[in-house]
Amino acid sequence: MKLDTQQISHLLSRQMYHLAPRKKLLIWGGSLGFVLLLLIVASSHQRIRSTILHRTPISTLPVISQEVITADYHPTLLTGFIPTDSDDSDCADFSPSGVIYSTDKLVLHDSLKDIRDSLLKTQYKDLVTLEDEEKMNIDDILKRWYTLSGSSVWIPGMKAHLVVSRVMYLGTNGRSDPLVSFVRVQLFDPDFNELKDIALKFSDKPDGTVIFPYILPVDIPREGSRWLGPEDAKIAVNPETPDDPIVIFNMQNSVNRAMYGFYPFRPENKQVLFSIKDEEPRKKEKNWTPFFVPGSPTTVNFVYDLQKLTILKCSIITGICEKEFVSGDDGQNHGIGIFRGGSNLVPFPTSFTDKDVWVGFPKTHMESCGCSSHIYRPYLMVLVRKGDFYYKAFVSTPLDFGIDVRSWESAESTSCQTAKNVLAVNSISNWDLLDDGLDKDYMTITLSEADVVNSVLRVRGIAKFVDNLTMDDGSTTLSTSNKIDECATTGSKQYCQRYGELH
């Protein structure tokens, strides 16, 4: 039977399927212009869960499933600050507040043994084996391994959440001094049940098929004897090419610790090194916050500096970046401050006529405040572009979503009286509206707790809160005022003092 264009589009947009061994089915024509095939590879050790006769889909659920809608949501007070051109104003004069709602966290699990076993079959084997391990039992060996910093993005063509996490191998070193890091890639259905033994073929080359879960095949420079490999991996996707995600990370090379991008579903030219045009590379580049500007399918933007707002625009082909926007005097030294990169930025789920709006969760790093030498917490930031001008339309005080954060030293404790106390939002996987409008928005975020626990939770109410903000003043006078950062810094210190009193 000959299919017309509409029928072909319908078939290609259908979700992926579990298939019986040695069967394959054309399932998805991606935006890259190549066709993806889904295969399930037979294994003598594992059973395939579904049969081709039933063609059971991976999921019949949309990204907002009934489970997401009917989950228990708990209120969280959201307070923060909007811009002002008056440095003499009191912080309370421009401090809107509201209520958002979040679910309990859902912890994502992975097997350290499976991770180690898979790495021993790769080109990285020599990086993860020390001689003393020949006489060690497997339980003691696995104490040298950690997973952390899970980051997720929803891939519409796969109808699944694609999650990347950092894997650290310490060797005989301490937890803060790993020998090497890798990027683990997992696949989850809309309700975050892991999907295993899914093989995805995206080219006919020898390395053109991946089987989930797997280790991202990053080209790792062998520079030095520790801190090798990709660190702080984040995943993001351009809404205009929604099935072509990019993994962003920093990695040491022969020159510096630089920022890289990696496209896992491209048949070639997967890895790109980012550099700023006409500038000498800094010794250490990290914490770049990715986002995408409408109408720019061949570029990725980064918030390069959150204190002195600096925006980069980078080619995804060459990796060359230009400074698209710098607030204030480019030569002015604002200092590092407490603000660090966290999640990706995602666009507001409905469009504005005169501006572009993004939302994300950077993090604060507060030293010797409250209860710990170093406290990290996420905060909500709204970034706006009007014409060529960018500004922060809202910066919240720190958020913890009602979580008693796990102790840095013990899984059995939530004590904050330790060297570090860490909660960070690593990604916004999706942010979608039901037909009812802004009152029914659902956001999925991934969290990292104590740098050992990866989890996800759902958040409601951010769309309505952002829509109610005053974002009409794109005046360039706002670019020279640090008042919003000063007030957010004060609010952050007040938060950690209160948290310390309770923990």
Swiss-Prot record:
Topological category with respect to the lipid bilayer: Single-pass type II membrane protein
Residues on Extracellular side: 46-503
Side of membrane Cytoplasmic, spans: 1-24
GO CC annotation, single: membrane
GO biological process, one term: cell wall organization
Residues bearing glycans: N468
Main location: membrane
Family indicated by similarity: Belongs to the BMT family.
Descriptive protein name: Beta-mannosyltransferase 4
Organism: Komagataella phaffii (strain GS115 / ATCC 20864)
Lineage, highest ranks first: Eukaryota, Fungi, Dikarya, Ascomycota, Saccharomycotina
